[in-house]
A protein has these predicted regions:
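Domain-edge interaction signal
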Residues: 1-211
């Protein structure tokens, strides 16, 4: 069973995370975003955070994702969508699952209220995904190590997004293997660069139709 947010502050963060995604989507020329894509973007933001910021607690741990037929799911995100639609922060466009920024959204809520650091992390994730397009997000999710581990376990447990999740372990192994080839140059690469290289690697598997 999924947990409710601990307090209204957590629910407010969910609202602003969603609105930030729509703002960032507009910045990368995605005029519309599917609701399922928002679940997937927030899952990737959660599961990858501790690789990029291992010294910090994960601010996206407010999300409690389970595996649904369409990918990661959190009922609190669904409830947030209902609220944001009702108050016209977002609006339906070409279908029941497709949305765009509504008439009540303003730039202030996207960056100031969400917090600069949280916003910048969402921006990094969105800009990486923007290279490949919204239609490829599910392919990245399907090949996500933690997502695959949870599916194969065939249990009702949620998706683990803490610092010991399978995705972080895979990224660390990827980094170590890459550093072996770099030798003395390894200090020149940042965690963000490794993250981008990892997405390139996964995308190559998508093109080859490999798991």
């Amino acid at each position: 069973m999924e947990k409710e947010p601990k307090d209204k502050g957590d629910q407010y963060l969910i609202y602003t995370d969603i609105l930030a995604i729509f703002k960032l989507a507009s910045d990368i020329q995605w005029k519309e975003v599917r609701q399922n894509s928002v679940y997937r973007i927030l899952y990737l933001s959660s599961v990858l955070y501790s690789f990029r910021h291992p010294e910090k607690s994960n601010p996206f741990s407010i999300y409690k994702f389970t595996v649904d037929t369409t990918g990661p799911y959190d009922s609190n995100i669904s409830k947030a969508f209902d609220f944001l639609i009702k108050d016209e922060y977002i609006k339906r466009t070409t279908g029941d699952d497709v949305f765009a920024i509504g008439k009540n959204s303003s730039n202030d809520v996207f960056k100031i209220e969400i917090g600069q650091e949280r916003y910048e992390w969402l921006k990094q994730v969105m800009y990486i995904l923007g290279i490949y397009g919204e239609n490829k997000i599910y392919d990245f999710i399907f090949r996500d190590p933690q997502y695959q581990t949870t599916i194969k376990s065939n249990t009702q447990q949620g998706l683990n997004t803490d610092i010991n999740n399978e995705t972080i372990k895979t990224l660390k192994n990827f980094q170590e293997a890459f550093e072996e080839t770099l030798k003395d140059q390894k200090e020149k690469l940042s965690p963000q660069t490794y993250l981008e290289l990892y997405f390139e690697y996964i995308f190559s598997k998508i093109l080859k139709r490999e798991d």
